[in-house]
Amino acid sequence: MLYFLYKILNINILNYITVRAGIAFFAAFFLTAFFMPRFIAWAKNKHANQPIYELAPQSHKAKNKTPTMGGIVFITATLLSSLLCSNLTNTFVIGGILCLFGFSFIGFKDDYGKIAGHSNHAGMSPRKKFMYQIGLSFALSIILFLFANLSGEFFIPFYKYALFNLQFFAIFFWMLVITASSNSVNLTDGLDGLASIPSIFALVSLGIFVYLCGHSVFSAYLFLPKVVGVGELCVVIFALIGAILGFLWYNCYPAQVFMGDSGSLSVGAFIGYTGVVSKNEILLIIIGFVFVIETLSVILQVGSFKIRKKRIFLMAPIHHHFELKGWNENKIIVRFWIIALIANIIALTTLKLR
């Protein structure tokens, strides 16, 4: 809407992506901060509480009365702010909005099933949820390849030129990146605020890359891939950052609400989507280092048990391992935040070191 006001009324300041991204950030933050306590009160009244996994550390038993599905509020705030501030004719923006909405809907169906069944196992089956994720990721990849004309060029960190062009096979690569990113954030979302700050760090880094890749002068100077029109996605990125900050106000320890799958699946998928459109699919390993470690811990744990009948960790994902080792929850959370910050600083150095 604001972008079209610039077109109609010739309000030049609204032409700037940075201005509209700033407005979207504050709009999403205040919308989330205003509606979240009302959602918490409603959820408590409806007993929409987070079912606790029976094998979870004992400290988690006290959280069984905490409302979940807070992701509905901050994703809705993100979508409203994006609709208000972004150029809705931009294909990258349309794809980003569809990504947030679609994965949040998948997460909502899973959350609702768990709440209705009063069990952590009562949601969608892992196979069904995975198929939905793959299907939506494939659709988004088709949009990027056919309608956004996104190149299939493959880049790696610290090297300025594309290694090769995946051509049509880029669709399947992007599909895997978006799906993997969605699940990795979902696995990380196990402690109060643990997924929120690393997500914000990742989105800030990706927002910088997206803006620079969409800018003809900066992309040429820094030897970044030029992606025409992708800079507009910054509006959606910073709307989501503002919304997550608004959510964190109520999710910091001790949490008053959890984001649930309706939040974590959506945030993770959008991080993957943003990495794809900025041609940073491999750099996502550094940008989302905490998410990668959490996911690897689960893969190693399951693989080790199936092959060796032995577990590597006391419990996976790895943040539960540290809980069972006696670490305080706050210590785990803050240390993971520090790791995420360092990883993203390293990722940003690739802007010049290439």
Swiss-Prot record:
The UniProt entry lists the main location of this chain as: membrane
Copy the pathway line from the protein's UniProt record: Cell wall biogenesis; peptidoglycan biosynthesis
Which UniProt key words apply to this protein? Cell cycle, Cell division, Cell inner membrane, Cell membrane, Cell shape, Cell wall biogenesis/degradation, Magnesium, Membrane, Metal-binding, Peptidoglycan synthesis, Transferase, Transmembrane, Transmembrane helix
Which reaction is the catalytic activity of this chain? Answer: UDP-N-acetyl-alpha-D-muramoyl-L-alanyl-gamma-D-glutamyl-meso-2,6-diaminopimeloyl-D-alanyl-D-alanine + di-trans,octa-cis-undecaprenyl phosphate = di-trans,octa-cis-undecaprenyl diphospho-N-acetyl-alpha-D-muramoyl-L-alanyl-D-glutamyl-meso-2,6-diaminopimeloyl-D-alanyl-D-alanine + UMP
- Report the transmembrane regions from the record: 23-43, 66-86, 88-108, 138-158, 161-181, 193-213, 227-247, 257-277, 282-302, 331-351
The way it spans or sits in the membrane comes to: Multi-pass membrane protein
BP term (GO), one: peptidoglycan biosynthetic process
Q: Span of the secretion signal?
A: none
User: What is an example of a GO molecular function annotated in this UniProt entry?
Assistant: metal ion binding
Domain of life (superkingdom): Bacteria
Q: What S-S linkages are listed for this chain?
A: none
User: What's the EC number here?
Assistant: 2.7.8.13
* Protein family per UniProt: Belongs to the glycosyltransferase 4 family. MraY subfamily.
Reported function: Catalyzes the initial step of the lipid cycle reactions in the biosynthesis of the cell wall peptidoglycan: transfers peptidoglycan precursor phospho-MurNAc-pentapeptide from UDP-MurNAc-pentapeptide onto the lipid carrier undecaprenyl phosphate, yielding undecaprenyl-pyrophosphoryl-MurNAc-pentapeptide, known as lipid I.
Protein name stated in the entry:
Phospho-N-acetylmuramoyl-pentapeptide-transferase
Q: Which organism is it from?
A: Campylobacter hominis (strain ATCC BAA-381 / DSM 21671 / CCUG 45161 / LMG 19568 / NCTC 13146 / CH001A)
